[in-house]
A protein has these predicted regions:
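Intrinsic low-complexity, intrinsically disordered or marginally ordered coil/linker segments
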Residues: 1-245, 255, 270-277
Length: 277
């Protein structure tokens, strides 16, 4: 399974143009607020290909296509999908025409990520869309979208579930990156940004604080330990982390945990930076 990347896309500019863009990128599903295929469509010829590509003879290809046309597939193939082989000649032509001979390589080259967007959150007509992608943020897909709407600004903030790593922010306008910020993995800035992005959905912390008690306690203790790392004390990060934990524990009425967190907060002199207040 891949690492899931949380992406928060904000589209700004002329309201009429923003709404036009939102209507174009919306997928077929009720909760599919962004579908990369609507503005950066993968060629039909690459659908259901294999990665790495499977080269077969022309005879095998004809037999394969006949099976597909007649729906003569095994139960496993019907359930999990049928991966098509292609001929050597097709592979060469696809590379020349599309730059890739299979879906995976094409996605990476044109979307910047393995799959289409999933686990999406937004409201109808809202200019902010939160969604997940596999392994990486879809920089190339959003770059293509921004080139189609040159008067709009597309800002993306993203964070890996590998907390504090593969996290950053960029803005694209008219197909060009006008702003970028990728803090060093594991740094205070990266951890702050990741907590802010994941916290927008009460995702990263609440999953652990609200579900399995043992996992929740282990996670709380690990963050407390992280908060007290010497290198973070001068940055105000300890209290930033612990106050967030306290807020979530109070919401879940976990009062014993609240008391434990308060004890750790009081034991350290570090204060929240003025910009956190």
């Amino acid at each position: 399974m891949p690492n899931h990347i949380t992406n928060i896309l904000t589209i700004t500019g002329d309201e009429q143009e923003v709404q036009k863009c939102l209507a174009e990128i919306k997928g077929q599903g009720e909760d599919q607020f962004i579908d990369f295929n609507t503005f950066a469509p993968m060629p039909k010829e690459l659908e259901n290909t294999q990665s790495p590509v499977k080269i077969i003879s022309q005879k095998e290809y004809d037999e394969q296509e006949a099976r597909i046309a007649n729906n003569d597939l095994t139960d496993i193939e019907k359930q999990w999908g049928f991966s098509r082989g292609i001929t050597k000649e097709m592979s060469k032509r696809f590379k020349e025409e599309f730059g890739a001979d299979n879906w995976y390589d094409w996605h990476l080259a044109n979307w910047g990520t393995k799959w289409n967007a999933y686990d999406q959150i937004s409201e109808e007509g809202d200019n902010v869309i939160t969604f997940d992608t596999a392994w990486s943020t879809p920089f190339d897909a959003i770059q293509t979208l921004s080139a189609k709407y040159p008067t709009l600004s597309f800002n993306v903030r993203y964070a890996d579930e590998d907390f504090g790593h593969n996290v950053g922010e960029y803005t694209l306008e008219d197909g060009e990156e006008t702003y970028g910020n990728v803090p060093d993995g594991g740094s205070v800035d990266a951890l702050r940004m990741a907590m802010d992005i994941k916290g927008n959905e009460d995702y990263y912390l609440t999953d652990y604080l609200s579900n399995d008690a043992d996992e929740g306690e282990n996670f709380t203790n690990s963050l407390i330990q992280l908060a007290h790392e010497k290198e973070f004390l001068e940055e105000g990060y300890p209290v930033f982390v612990l106050e967030k934990l306290k807020e979530l524990a109070l919401a879940d009425e976990q009062f014993e945990r609240v008391a434990e967190i308060e004890k750790h907060i009081e034991s350290k002199p570090a204060e929240i930076d003025e910009d956190e207040e």
